[in-house]
């Protein structure tokens, strides 16, 4: 693959080479053109983060050495890059820590608001009360969050709100959600073509995420569609939203139940208003497209 990329670069003689994520670093050709790194995560930091559950010793050691290797590769390429594009200011700070001299800009993940209209609220009195988890289930941090939701949070939520259900939606090529089929209070949906009908019947998005990185597109999606977001600090760490204004934080099942009670008791309206406004202001596609265009043109100008 590396030889093919090198041959293509030699043939095209591009004005710049854009490396889209850390995972393509091993196949980058020797750079005769300016290098732009588009980093969706600082992957070394993601690998170094502890899991939601304690992993076996061999797996922890493997991840430790993988994290060091990836971080080293990221640092070297950041040092050689003409520009680094990160998806959050949090990742930009991490990139500057690895390569203090790099020119780095933030261009956030965005959504197509034309396809994500503001939905009418789900009535607080409607039955059942439904919390929604949306995310790619094949991504380990998401599956770990689903496990925690079903095994730890759902019993507490159902004790506080009898009849409550948790709906699980997201690409599940490996069929990992099958283990939750038949669990009381769990609606296993899996892969769908359109997420909007599932947001439409949800009272809140509930995200007990403990690991991973980058920007949580699922939160931006919920803001756009007008659903209150309940999440851990890690779930929302890279976003511009303010805790208490754009989303509500929980770290334990009891806290989650209390925050849901506040939302159902009238707190949803302000969260929805603020979340949609933030999505319109910062997280719509035209904002990102303009920023990406300007960033790349700043590197290729005069070439």
Which sequence ranges carry the predicted segments?
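Conserved catalytic-core segment of nucleotide-activated headgroup transferases in glycan assembly
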Residues: 110-119, 123-182, 188-201
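Short hydrophobic beta-strand element within catalytic cores of glycosyltransferases
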Residues: 218-222, 228-232
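Donor nucleotide-sugar binding/catalytic pocket of nucleotide-sugar-dependent glycosyltransferases
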Residues: 44, 63-118
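Acceptor-binding helix/loop patch of EC 2.4 sugar-transfer enzymes
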Residues: 37-72, 136
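Acidic donor-binding loop of glycosyltransferase active sites
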Residues: 82, 185, 200-214, 225-227
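Conserved nucleotide-sugar donor-binding subdomain of glycosyltransferases
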Residues: 1-25, 58-80
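A charged, aromatic-enriched C-terminal amphipathic alpha-helix characteristic of glycosyltransferases
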Residues: 269-297
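Conserved acidic donor-binding segment of nucleotide-sugar-dependent glycosyltransferases
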Residues: 245-254, 262-267
């Amino acid at each position: 693959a590396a030889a093919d990329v090198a041959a293509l670069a030699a043939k095209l003689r591009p004005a710049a080479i854009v490396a889209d994520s850390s995972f393509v670093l091993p196949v980058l050709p020797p750079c005769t053109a300016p290098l732009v790194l588009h980093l969706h995560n600082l992957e070394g930091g993601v690998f170094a983060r502890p899991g939601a559950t304690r992993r076996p010793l061999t797996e922890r050691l493997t991840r430790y050495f993988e994290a060091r290797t990836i971080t080293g590769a990221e640092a070297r390429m950041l040092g050689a890059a003409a520009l680094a594009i990160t998806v959050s200011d949090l990742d930009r700070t991490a990139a500057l820590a690895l390569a203090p001299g790099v020119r780095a800009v933030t261009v956030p993940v965005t959504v197509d608001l034309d396809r994500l209209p503001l939905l009418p609220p789900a009535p607080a009195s409607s039955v059942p009360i439904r919390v929604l988890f949306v995310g790619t289930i094949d991504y380990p941090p998401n599956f770990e969050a689903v496990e925690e939701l079903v095994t730890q949070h759902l019993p507490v939520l159902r004790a506080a709100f009898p009849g409550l259900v948790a709906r699980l939606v997201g690409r599940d090529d490996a069929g990992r959600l099958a283990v939750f089929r038949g669990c009381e209070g769990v609606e296993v949906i899996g892969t769908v073509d359109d997420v909007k009908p599932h947001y439409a019947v949800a009272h809140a998005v509930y995200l007990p995420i403990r690991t991973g990185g980058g920007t949580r597109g699922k939160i931006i999606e919920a803001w756009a569609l007008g659903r209150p977001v309940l999440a851990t600090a890690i779930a929302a760490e890279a976003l511009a939203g303010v805790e208490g204004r754009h989303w509500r934080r929980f770290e334990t099942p009891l806290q989650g139940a209390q925050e849901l009670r506040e939302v159902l008791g009238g707190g949803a309206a302000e969260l929805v208003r603020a979340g949609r406004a933030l999505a319109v202001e910062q997280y719509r596609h035209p904002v990102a497209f303009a920023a990406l265009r300007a960033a790349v043109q700043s590197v290729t100008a005069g070439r």
